[in-house]
A protein has these predicted regions:
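Beta-propeller blade termini and top-face loops
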Residues: 1-329
């Protein structure tokens, strides 16, 4: 929980415990609850084992982020795991799911999906074959080897506790950041997907449009994507951090055409960098870092056509002093 808007405001996050069904609450602290960490805290994930309500797990973002376990309903705590698998981006990946029948088995969605079979002492990746960035897990209470995981790639299920995974391909859950069309008849659709690359597909196809009619043109997080109006075999596809390629749709030959920094200079790109294609001037694109760039030769070269359009305030570029307990990667 935020302690205020100021970068110097202290976090107001905390863990609270009730012994009377929620009528009254007492904060869990390092001073009164042995083994619990010292403040300040960021995000906290807490869950109670369904088969034993005395067993509580808490993943605490702090200056020493770690997983903690209590065997007495939150009165005392034991630090369990603080490996890189556990603590990576704790402000973002912070949920715990305990097996309904086995309190020693729990999952934590993370960059992948990790699982512990020893009460949180150690974790191993069980998300092999799924997409990255897991967010939610459901364990079948009738058959705890049957598990669903939701991630940036969609929904997956396993029938053997996570050894093998099957994707549910009939769910239209992909998120487009941007789409564009070309001048073909019927026209093609171009778009970048959140954490699922850049794609081009048909707007109409005999028998209907299936997954096979979509072609992958780049990896990463897909953002802006355009077909060259003068030669629609060539596509401009952008991914995170201002990375942009010119790719031949038929040969898939690709070339990096991102504008380069000058000597002893650093360009500052947004995660989703603005990109625009001129509909009137052949081979002309515009792209924005702190400067506006223009190319008139399909990305072979770029001209800087503006001064720094940002405040370039160093005080606003310091993650370590942003008020967060941990910083982003």
């Amino acid at each position: 929980r935020s302690g205020g808007e100021s970068p110097t405001a202290k976090s107001a996050s905390g863990l609270y415990r009730s012994g009377d069904g929620g009528a009254n609450w007492t904060e869990v602290t390092a001073a009164s609850n042995k083994g619990f960490p010292e403040k300040p805290f960021g995000r906290i994930a807490v869950t109670v084992a369904p088969s034993n309500s005395n067993i509580v797990y808490a993943f605490v973002e702090s200056t020493d982020s770690a997983l903690f376990r209590s065997d007495d309903g939150g009165k005392t705590w034991d630090k369990r795991d603080k490996s890189q698998l556990m603590v990576w981006r704790p402000f973002y990946f912070a949920s715990l799911i305990v097996d309904p029948k086995n309190p020693e088995r729990l999952f934590k969605p993370d960059l992948g999906l990790i699982q512990s079979l020893d009460g949180g002492k150690s974790f191993a990746n069980v998300g092999g074959g799924t997409h990255g960035d897991s967010h939610v897990v459901w364990i079948d209470p009738g058959d705890t080897q049957h598990v669903y995981v939701g991630d940036d790639g969609g929904l997956w299920q396993s029938f053997d506790g996570g050894n093998k995974w099957w994707k549910q391909n009939n769910l239209p859950v992909s998120q487009f950041y941007h789409v564009s069309l070309d001048g073909a008849d019927p026209f093609h659709v171009y778009g970048g997907l959140q954490d699922n690359a850049c794609w081009v597909g048909d707007s109409a196809y005999p028998g209907g449009i299936a997954n096979a009619q979509w072609e992958n043109m780049c990896g990463g997080d897909g953002f802006f994507m355009f077909a060259d109006p003068a030669d629609q075999d060539y596509i401009y596809a952008e991914t995170q951090g201002g990375a942009i390629i010119r790719v031949n749709r038929h040969t898939h030959e690709a070339r990096d055409i991102q504008p380069r920094a000058g000597y002893n200079e650093k360009l500052r790109w947004n995660w989703n960098t603005p990109l625009e294609l001129s509909p009137n001037e052949k081979g002309t694109l515009y792209m924005g870092a702190q400067f506006l760039f223009r190319t008139r030769d399909h990305g072979q070269s770029w001209d800087r056509i503006s001064p720094d359009l940002t405040t370039n305030d160093p005080q606003k570029q310091k993650q370590e002093e942003s008020g967060g307990v941990t910083v982003d990667n």
